[in-house]
Amino acid sequence: MKTFLLYAVTAVAEIVGCYLPWRWLKEGGSIWLLVPGALSLALFAWLLTLHGTAAGRVYAAYGGVYVAVAIAWLWCVDKVRPTLWDAAGVVFTLAGMAIIAFQPRV
């Protein structure tokens, strides 16, 4: 559970770090959105270092959680209800994440 939570917090940091510049560019938001956006991306990079395995494995497993958090963002922030296809994609990516993240260590 701790691993999944760390991946989820990492995903939120990345999404916020990308969303704020997007708002500035796409929706004419304040240029000051770039400051918390940059800080959030720096936090994202630091959080990735807290995962205790090889970087490639971390990125692969993190990707599954990122998809789940992005779909939650779609629903909660963008106010777009996910489709059944979105939900199926989340299930499959989380299954892949679990296989990678929780494999036996030898």
Swiss-Prot record:
Organism's domain of life?
Bacteria
GO cellular component labels: plasma membrane
| The entry's keywords | Cell inner membrane, Cell membrane, Membrane, Transmembrane, Transmembrane helix
- Tell me what topology the record assigns in the membrane: Multi-pass membrane protein
Q: Which residues cross the membrane?
A: 2-22, 30-50, 58-78, 82-102
Just give the chief location class.
membrane
Q: Subcellular location, in the record's words?
A: Cell inner membrane
One Pfam family matching this protein: UPF0060
Listed PANTHER family: UPF0060 MEMBRANE PROTEIN YNFA
Q: Per the similarity annotation, which family is this?
A: Belongs to the UPF0060 family.
Q: What is this protein called?
A: UPF0060 membrane protein Bxeno_B1021
- Origin organism is Paraburkholderia xenovorans (strain LB400)
Q: Source taxonomy lineage?
A: Bacteria, Pseudomonadati, Pseudomonadota, Betaproteobacteria, Burkholderiales
